[in-house]
Curated annotation (Swiss-Prot):
InterPro entries: CBS_dom, CBS_dom_sf, Diverse_CBS-Domain, UCP005063_CBS, WH-like_DNA-bd_sf, WH_DNA-bd_sf, WHTH_HrcA_DNA-bd. GO terms for biological process: regulation of DNA-templated transcription. Keywords: CBS domain, Repeat. The lineage of its organism: Archaea, Methanobacteriati, Methanobacteriota, Methanomada group, Methanococci. It comes from Methanocaldococcus jannaschii (strain ATCC 43067 / DSM 2661 / JAL-1 / JCM 10045 / NBRC 100440). It comes from the Archaea. This is Uncharacterized protein MJ1232. Residues 176-232, 236-292 form the CBS domain.
Length: 296
């Protein structure tokens, strides 16, 4: 879509003001910001409305609001704008994104409500719809709720919060187990089981000549309990899944789920083992139990 320089300038300022004030913006406010004649702004707004880039809100508190098409016309999403989605009936609602989340009645004994400010058409949603908001970018916050109100003018969904979850924005290298015990591939399962019992661990990397060659767990030993004197190299898992120390625990969970594993070996820039992180470690962190050596 080809816009004139003036149209792009006005549209960008409308978006800036709308983000700042979160309400319909009057033409006089845009004129004041751009040092332009209000009549010029009014004429250009008519053209922008015809292009479906701007919606007009009537009434004393009315004004102009940008449509989702306006953001695309200015290439804002293509420049890396973070999209926080909304899902309804398990499907992502296209053309709608969350720009602000507010919690109220948090001290109420029997309920908690939230105001979900969006960009896009609120008419995609109806009272009683069950929705999922998120995850947000930074802390991967996900909110599940039931819509109990809708403000079409200010583009707000009022929901009864059914549940909230969050995955802290923490590097695996900051919370992983740093005291790593490794196993030689020529050790027997009996020797490995003894080490696991002494060190209170349930798995370990297998290292040969400083090279990571596999991983062995209590589950592997249990499956071979009738052959307890087998060598580790005969039963270890060879497709070792690693994660860089600077990756986040959210990324670790995704890798674990994708590869159906319960632990990852943490490595540094030189692919040297610097720790281990398990699914249990992550669940403890999500529940608020951080390791004693945690630091950021």
């Amino acid at each position: 879509m080809e816009l004139t320089v003036v149209q792009r300038e006005i549209l960008q300022e409308l978006i800036n003001l709308y983000r700042e004030k979160n309400r319909p913006i009057k033409g006089t406010e845009i004129a004041l910001r751009l040092n332009r004649n209000p009549g010029t702004i009014r004429n250009q707004m008519q053209a922008l409305r015809a292009l479906d880039l701007v919606d007009g809100v009537p009434g004393p508190k009315g004004g102009y609001v940008p449509t989702s098409k306006a953001y695309r016309a200015l290439g804002l999403e293509d420049e890396g704008e973070i999209i926080v989605p909304i899902y309804k009936d398990g499907k992502k609602v296209e053309g709608v994104k969350v720009v602000k989340i507010e919690f109220d009645t948090v001290s109420h004994e029997k309920c908690c409500s939230s105001k979900i400010h969006i960009e896009g058409d609120t008419k995609h949603f109806n009272i009683g719809d069950i929705i999922r908001v998120g995850p947000t970018y930074h802390n991967k916050i996900i909110i599940n709720g039931k819509i109990i109100g809708r403000d079409d003018i200010h583009r707000i969904l009022l929901i009864d919060v059914l549940g909230v979850s969050s995955i802290p924005n923490i590097k695996v290298g900051d919370v992983g187990i740093k005291e790593v015990w490794t196993i030689n591939p020529n050790c027997t399962l009996r020797e490995t089981a003894k080490l696991f019992a002494e060190k209170y661990i349930s798995g370990a990397p297998v290292v040969d000549n400083d090279k990571l060659v596999g991983v062995i767990s209590l589950h592997d030993i249990a499956e071979n309990i009738d052959n307890i004197d087998k060598k580790v190299k005969e039963v270890m898992r060879r497709d070792v899944i690693t994660i860089h120390k600077d990756e986040k625990i959210y990324d670790a969970l995704k890798i674990m789920n994708k590869n159906n594993v319960g632990r990852l070996v943490i490595v540094d820039d030189n692919n040297k083992i610097v720790g281990i992180i398990t699914r249990t470690d992550i669940l403890k962190i999500i529940s608020g139990k951080f390791p004693e050596n945690f630091h950021t």
